[in-house]
A protein has these predicted regions:
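Active-site loop immediately N-terminal to the catalytic Tyr-X3-Lys motif
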Residues: 95, 142-148, 170-171, 189, ...
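Conserved glycine-rich cofactor-binding loop
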Residues: 9, 16-17
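Short, small/polar-rich loop/turn modules that mediate ligand/substrate recognition or access, typified
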Residues: 169, 174, 242-244
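Catalytic loop of short-chain dehydrogenase/reductase
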Residues: 133-156, 161-170, 182-183, 214
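Conserved mid-core segment of classical short-chain dehydrogenase/reductases
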Residues: 72, 81, 89-103, 126, ...
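Alpha-helical segment proximal to the catalytic Tyr-Lys
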Residues: 122, 166-167, 240
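Catalytic Tyr-X3-Lys loop
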Residues: 88, 95-114, 133, 150, ...
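Short C-terminal tail/terminal secondary-structure segment
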Residues: 18, 142, 220, 232, ...
Length: 258
């Protein structure tokens, strides 16, 4: 399936590592010109060298000055696709997280996206085409008690996506939210391997994963590549009728009708 992304330029925030890097790789494989983003000097350059693709850009988008730095670096490029992948799930609780930590979560998970949307949206409107894809979590619909500042901020990102979709009606710019459940990262795999071996589930990942995923209807944990493939499809002209949606990719965990 050709996603028709050749000639499109995509910025993937936080793509110097993890799921963001895999999203950048997937978009590049589909023909897009990809800007690989790091928050600190050297991060994006190292990722581009590792991947053998993309162009490095830098800016700490958790504050206005860093976002402006990033926008200035991209002054000669028209961004067709903005993937707001960057975000963090810092540990916390209702009794221990300070109000400052709540503000930090909002800066990282909401305003980092808002700053770039505000800056890049006028050119997308003028072009009559664009894609804005925000990375959320199923926790914005079903939050846990722990890390409340994280879930509250991701809930704000979800409602921001819907508000923006209404603003962009009939503009040619599409905006959606991708909400993964648990994703198989190296850290998740290592944690479950250690737990599984302690509990006697087995010694290999193939033996342990069915136990780790016992509450997931598909019987396994979602891979980062699957999230990247969904993002790439939403970034493409083929997804033109998908707008203002919160698309869950969780293996069927969130069994609700909405």
């Amino acid at each position: 399936l050709d996603l028709n992304l050749t000639g499109k330029c995509a910025l993937v925030t936080g793509s110097y590592r993890g799921t963001g890097m895999i999203i950048a790789q997937c978009l590049a494989r589909e023909g897009a010109r990809v800007l690989v983003h790091g928050l600190k000097a050297g991060q994006a350059e190292a990722a581009v060298e590792q991947l053998g693709l993309g162009e490095p850009v830098t800016g700490d988008i958790t504050n206005d000055d860093g976002a402006a730095q990033l926008i200035n670096q991209m002054a000669g490029s028209h961004i067709d696709v903005l993937v707001n992948n960057y975000g963090t799930a810092d540990a916390g609780s209702w009794e221990t997280s300070s109000s400052d930590e709540w503000v930090v979560a909002y800066q990282k998970n909401v305003l980092s996206a808002q700053r770039l949307i505000t800056s890049l949206l006028p050119a997308m409107r003028d072009a009559g085409w664009g894609r804005i894809i925000n990375l959320g979590t199923i926790g914005s619909t079903r939050p846990n008690a722990r890390n409340p500042q994280y879930y509250a901020s991701k809930g704000a990102l979800a409602t921001m996506t819907v508000s923006l979709a209404k603003e962009l009606a009939a503009s040619g710019v599409r905006v959606n939210l991708v909400s993964p459940g648990i994703i198989l990262t190296p850290e998740v795999e290592a944690a479950y391997l250690a737990r599984g071996q302690r509990k006697g589930w087995g010694s290999t990942w193939d033996e342990i994963e069915p136990h780790a995923a016992r509450d997931i209807p598909i019987g396994r944990i979602t891979r980062r590549e699957e999230v990247a493939s969904l993002v790439a499809y939403l970034a493409s002209p083929l997804a033109d009728a998908i707008h203002g949606q919160n698309i869950k990719i969780d293996g069927g965990i969130l069994d609700i009708v909405s």
